[in-house]
Amino acid sequence: GIGDMLKVATDYKAKVFGVALKDRASILPAGHAANAAYWWDTSAGHFITSTYYMNQLPEWVKKFNKTIQVKPGTDVKGVPDGVTKTFQMAKAVLDNEHLGEGPVTDMLAISISSTDIIGHAYGTRGKENYDVYMRTDEELAKFLTYLDSKVGKGNYLFFLSADHGGMHNANVMKQHKIPADGYAAWNEIKPLNAAFKEKYGIEKVA
C-alpha cells in the first residue's frame, strides 16, 4: 500500500497513521509498517488499537478518549456523530504525533465509515444518508481549514477516494418500475440455526 511505500521511500522515517471507525478501514490504508492504526470499539465507547502496533495506548490517546467517551454499546458508527468523532481523532493524531512538522513527508489515512454503514442500511435516498453526507461535508471543510493553518496551504497533498458507490433502496426502484429486490437475510437465520443444532449440536450461530 501507499503507507508501506512511503515508509520504504523515506528509509522508514515517515510517520504513517490510520484512523477510522471500522478496524479494517483504518488498518488497510495505513499498511503493514504504519506507526499505528486507530479504530472505534463500540463495546468500550472509544478508540482503540492493536498490540500489533503497541502494547498500550499512548497517554495522549487515553486523555483524548476521555473527551469523546460514550456509554459502552452506543451506536456511533451508524450515525452522523461517527463522522465527527473520526475527524476529532484525526486532528488529535495530527497534533500529538506532530505530523507534517519535519523534513520528511508523513501520511494520515482517514476513512469515513459512517457513510458506508448508513448507505447500506438506508439506501442513497434516505434522510439518514442525506444527514451523514451533510455532516461529512461540514467536518471535511473544518479539517481542511485546520490543515491550512496547521501545516500550511501548499504544504500538504490531499486526495479523496471511495471503495464503492451506493444504490437506491429496492422499494424506491420498484415504485419506478425498475426490477429490484432485497435479500432478507433474517429469513435464513432460523433454518440455519436449526441445521447447525441438528448436525453439530450448536444452539445458535447467528
Question: Locations of the language-model features?
Answer:
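General structural feature for long, well-ordered alpha-helical segments within catalytic domains
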Residues: 2, 86, 136-139, 192
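His/Asp/Glu-rich, glycine-adjacent segments
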Residues: 1-104, 113-120
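Outer-membrane beta-barrel and related beta-rich outer-membrane complex signature
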Residues: 31, 122, 170-174
